[in-house]
Regions:
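Detector for C-terminal structural segments
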Residues: 59-60, 261-262, 267-279, 283, ...
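Short, well-ordered beta-strand elements
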Residues: 66, 71-81, 113, 123-126, ...
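A structural "hinge/loop" feature
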Residues: 66-91, 111, 194-203, 364, ...
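Aromatic- and charge-enriched surface segment that lines or borders ligand/interaction sites
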Residues: 113-159, 184-186, 194-195, 317, ...
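Ligand-site clamp/hinge motif
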Residues: 129, 253-258, 286-338, 478-482, ...
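Extracellular/periplasmic solute-recognition and catalytic clefts
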Residues: 154-162, 175-177, 270-282, 306-372, ...
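Surface-exposed binding/hinge segments that line
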Residues: 164-246
Length: 646
């Protein structure tokens, strides 16, 4: 039996927009809920309410691939020492109003047990499960969502740029409380993709702001108490910085450094992602899901992440049996042979995952550079084309990726109906002669060493920031790009860094260029086109100021007409109500994106996998974990140890 949640679902079509979708009905065994044995003593001592009281009236019911599991055990895994908060997000943080099913086929209920949408795709209504609770036992209601909306999202000090998930054509959503359990999201124009967006990426925003906890740090609610709090938190210069130090998006550091922050996640941190040698989480006693036998989830008691600096060390520790689960940074061709050979000694198996981004290695020049000379050159499409032709992609793939991959630009994968061959293949031919000829028209003068001079007569140098992440050997890739660029007169200086430092540079708009992978290889291109246009999402900052402008038209910088046309084309994708209309508009958008050619891709993605202990059950095979889908977090609650350790 495959993993499923036996409910009507909403696929990409919005033809059922007026239909109310119901969550799991209240089980017949509601009076006989069961809990993990580790909680028994707390309940007996009166330190914790009974499990039936902790659960909502209609908990979400999970159906498992291997059946009802067993309680107990600690899941051992690993995380990079710095800047790898995405690892935590993908493991324990994906609780949303609505959710994609694990096979990415349909959107269904989650925290909202019912939801409906208007026929014109402008109004969406959600009914929360009654009795939901934060991890500290306090009620989660519509008031928490309204706190996010009125006091965070619409507060220009806290949210100067509005998150695009909750805007249409630069205009923010209007959120209205109907009652304690019912909330309405209304847009000024059609937003046919809203449910899909809400189940993806940054759709967690409305449900991560506990009002009862965070209001103490908000000037509106505690103006008189803020000075004392600032004195106790000297690193925060004002109430805005103080508030932002207590909460953030789930893939940003503050979310994982504040142990006092209540959440709706299945596990809560007891050791933060900070200076310790490991990160530790224990079960949330108020988690709101059960299995078909009435057992409160999750099955596994706790999770530990060993903090390591080196992906190679991660792989070696996996083969020696020190981890029960791993997938980030080592699930690629670089480590596959070692990990395959180590399955017996490490007592683990390979599990297929569907992780197909738009490209595994993408050169992203900062089109909004604060250096006016570099900005002008980076924004010149012919410069980007010339640099693209200078790169010997096949040589990189052969030497760095042991032949796994194919030369390609940022593009939807060939297996998908939206595949655009022109977009995938344009400017990928290794042609240094053509590259040099194009560059001669842009920067004809050279210095004594053969490097090109900019219009001010200075050597044109690209400072390339490189973080060794995902196990994709980015430093090795950029060293080869550096050589190819030198052959056509472009000076690239490689600056190695870690992800945390790179994050800081992105948000300050300080980088010249960097290399990263790009989402959008499959259907997430509809909801997450961040590599195809300036779009305010995590990790992709090739045109941050333009993406800020796109989100609300009042911040950032107005882009050129060609980019504005690209943004307008995506607005049409968002507004489309039917599948056919949306599909055609997305094809139009991708054609415009190909015309703009904003980023330089190197290699089509390699097959991915994850490793799980042979002792782990209910592990879904072939799960998509691409982009901001945040898998495998939605299925981790059903994992269990066949022989849990005491």
């Amino acid at each position: 039996m495959g993993y499923q949640q036996k409910l009507p679902g909403l696929v990409m079509s919005t033809g059922l927009l007026s239909t109310v979708l119901l969550g799991a009905m209240c089980p017949a065994w509601a009076a006989d809920y069961k809990q993990a044995p580790m909680l028994d003593e707390q309940v007996k001592a009166g330190k914790l309410p009974a499990v039936a009281t902790r659960l909502p009236e209609k908990p979400y019911v999970e159906t498992m691939i291997d059946g009802v599991g067993k309680y107990g055990g600690t899941l051992r895994t690993t995380i990079l020492a710095n800047g790898d908060q995405y690892n935590l997000t993908r493991t324990i943080a994906n609780e949303l109003l609505v959710r994609w099913d694990p096979q990415w086929k349909k959107v269904g209920p989650s925290l909202a047990e019912e939801f409906k949408a208007s026929e014109d795709a402008t109004t969406y209504t959600f009914k929360l499960r009654k009795g939901l609770k934060w991890s500290d036992g306090q009620p989660f209601t519509v008031d928490d969502i309204m706190f996010w909306y009125e006091d965070v999202f619409m507060n220009n000090a806290l949210s100067p740029a509005k998150n695009p998930t909750f805007t249409v054509a630069g205009k923010p959503v209007k959120v209205t409380k109907i009652d304690d359990q019912t909330v309405e999201f209304k847009f000024e124009s059609p937003y046919g993709l809203f449910l899909q967006q809400l189940a993806y990426g940054q759709g967690h925003l409305p449900v991560i702001y506990p009002k009862h906890y965070l209001s103490q740090f908000h000037e509106k609610y505690n103006k008189e108490g803020i000075p004392a709090l600032l004195k106790a938190n000297p690193a925060a210069g004002d109430w805005v910085a103080l508030f932002n130090s207590k909460i953030s998006l789930t893939f940003q550091p503050p979310f994982w450094q504040n142990l006092q922050l209540p959440t709706l996640n299945p596990w809560v941190l007891t050791v933060p992602y900070a200076d310790s040698e490991r990160v530790v989480a224990t079960r949330n006693p108020y988690y709101w899901k059960v299995d078909t036998a009435g057992n409160q989830l999750p099955y596994i008691d706790g999770i530990t992440w060993a903090k390591l600096d080196d992906p190679q060390l991660m792989a070696l520790k996996m083969t020696s049996g020190e981890f029960d689960f791993a997938f980030r940074h080592i699930n690629n061709a670089t480590f596959k042979s070692v990990l395959f050979d180590g399955q017996k000694t490490g007592n683990y198996r390979f599990v297929d995952v569907k992780d197909l981004p738009a490209n595994d290695a993408v050169i992203q020049l900062n089109l909004n550079s604060t250096d006016p000379v570099k900005r002008k050159i980076f924004q010149n499409k012919d410069f980007r084309i010339a640099l693209s032709h200078a790169i010997n992609r096949q040589e990189i793939i052969d030497l760095v990726y042991v032949g796994q991959g194919a030369p390609a630009q940022v593009a939807v994968q060939p297996e998908h109906e939206l595949f655009n061959e022109r977009q995938a293949k344009q400017y990928t031919e290794f042609d240094p002669k053509r590259s040099a000829e194009m560059l001669d028209k842009i920067m004809p003068k050279k210095d004594a060493e053969g490097f090109r001079l900019d219009e001010a007569g200075k050597r044109f140098t690209i400072n390339f920031m490189v973080a060794d992440v995902f196990g994709l050997s980015y430093p090795d890739v950029v060293q080869m790009v550096q050589k190819y660029a030198k052959d056509v007169g472009i000076d690239i200086q490689l600056r190695t860094t870690d992800r945390a430092r790179l994050n800081t540079m992105w948000y300050a708009n300080e980088q010249d260029a960097y290399i990263w992978n790009c989402v959008g290889g499959l259907s997430e291109v509809y909801t997450d086109p961040r590599c195809y246009m300036p779009f305010q999402k995590a990790d992709i900052f090739f045109a941050m100021k333009w993406s800020e402008w796109y989100s609300n038209r009042s911040t950032g910088e107005e882009p050129p007409e060609s980019v504005k046309a690209l943004m307008a084309a995506y607005d049409k994708v968002n507004a489309a109500v039917t599948d056919d209309d949306r599909r055609q508009k997305m094809k139009d958008f991708l054609n415009l994106s190909a015309d703009n050619f904003l980023n330089i891709g190197i290699s089509r993605p390699m097959p991915k996998y994850m490793m799980t202990s042979n002792n782990l059950k209910n592990v879904v095979n072939g799960i998509p974990i691409t982009g901001n889908l945040w898998h495998p977090a939605p299925t981790l609650t059903q994992w269990y140890f066949d022989k849990p350790t005491k």
